[in-house]
Amino acid sequence: MRNFFTLFFAAIFSLGALILAIVACAGSTKNYSPINKIYCAELDLSQMKVSTVLPSLSSATLSSLGLPSYINIGLWSYCTVDSSHNIQSCSSPHGIQNFNLSSLVYDNINNNEALELMDSVASVVLPEKLKSKMTYYNNLVKCMFITILIGIVLTFVNLVFNVLRWIIHIRPLTWFGAFFSFFAFAALLVSIGSCLGTYSYIKYILKHNYSDYGISMSIGRNYQGLMWGAVVGALLNFILWCSVRSRPTVIYANAPIEEKPLI
């Protein structure tokens, strides 16, 4: 009976972690609520100093360039947001959404005359720390992307072992269940850790250069909430798997010894 309740609650926590991680992974892939409100980080371009970031367009304004006020960055794509915080559109998912602030600014200029005055994306001027360590940031973004997918797959596999463990009472199933539950938890933890660390540092750089560039960043709360919920669910699932007995407890009763009558 103890194993029944242990596996039951482990399945609930595992399923909850799986659903939360999948929803977080799908954030900003479509312009539908609530998917479009789930993002890793939000770029605030509403106060961007055009004369500094785009020197060749120093006389232009943010509105004349057609730039969005905000850009929500997801794992697969990003969404553009206007000054009223209404989401205008979301880009099509195309694999890992690398962080490249220059490209995000350049690709969202909706003014052909302005684009003609710019040579290329290299015309966008940004803090040196962002440009010099771009490869490092994107390696962390790749880590975040790959580990969340690994976490989702391992959590699903763990659910399969949970179902099998209800039917077949053998030790290898318990061992494999605990094995996959641990690495699912570890993968999800690494994913949210790399996300928080990467974008927090970029936020720090932009904050210390805000007076020159007027660009800031905030961390996506919905994404953080979903992912930390998935991590907690995966951790509880692992703890429960560690308390699953390999085999049901069997109590052997010895038959009473028949006493022989004294002669």
UniProtKB/Swiss-Prot annotation:
* Keywords from the named record: Cell membrane, Glycoprotein, Isopeptide bond, Membrane, Transmembrane, Transmembrane helix, Ubl conjugation
Compartment(s) where it occurs, according to its Swiss-Prot or TrEMBL record = Cell membrane
Q: Which residues lie on this side of the membrane: Cytoplasmic?
A: 1-6, 165-172, 245-263
Glycyl lysine isopeptide (Lys-Gly) (interchain with G-Cter in ubiquitin) cross-link: located at K260
**Which residues carry a glycan?**
N100, N209
Pfam families per UniProt: SUR7 (PF06687)
Membrane topology reported for the UniProt record? Multi-pass membrane protein
Q: Which domain of life is it from?
A: Eukaryota
Task: Please give the chief subcellular localization of this protein.
Answer: membrane
* Any further remark recorded for this protein: Present with 1660 molecules/cell in log phase SD medium.
Q: What does this protein do?
A: Contributes to the wild-type cellular response to nitrogen stress through signaling pathways that regulate the expression of genes involved in amino acid biosynthesis. Required for wild-type filamentous growth, cell growth, and cell-cell adhesion.
Q: Which family does it belong to?
A: Belongs to the SUR7 family.
Please give the name of this protein.
Protein PUN1
Traced from the root, the source organism's taxonomic lineage reads:
Eukaryota, Fungi, Dikarya, Ascomycota, Saccharomycotina
